[in-house]
Amino acid sequence: MKALFLATALLSLNLLAVAPAVPALPAGAKVAFTSPKDGATVATKFTAKFSVTGMKLEKAGAVKAGTGHHHLIIDGPATPAGQIVEKDLTHLHFGNGQSEAELTLTPGKHTLTLQFADGAHASYGPQMSQTITVNVK
């Protein structure tokens, strides 16, 4: 019984040691799509524009409190706080501090999730994300 307790305690400590750090957020901080609007019908090629309130938009690289950059997730959920945002064809990184992007999507219904993350791409979580739906014609 003592061995089981000890093993459980050690495993718990190990999990705590590798849990991702959750970046701190200023009160009232948020991101938003300025274009397109939720539910909009768009052409296969369109421009998405993003904004951030309560934090400063900066290039990726240095991790500084109150700063970060945008990521756009196509047809996927927001990245949990503290986790690194993936980088692939559906997880677009805007590490140069961009606040808009030209997108080309196939016809149909798509979700776009804007996700803000720190200079090392660690997600600020759901508070710093917004998901909209677009109908591509």
Where are these regions (language model features)?
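Positively charged n-region of N-terminal signal peptides that target proteins for export
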Residues: 1-4
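Bacterial N-terminal signal peptides
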Residues: 7-14
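Short, compositionally biased P/S/T/A/G/V-rich stretches that sit at domain boundaries
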Residues: 21-43
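Long, low-complexity serine/threonine/glycine- and acidic-rich segments characteristic of extracellular
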Residues: 24, 39, 45-53, 57, ...
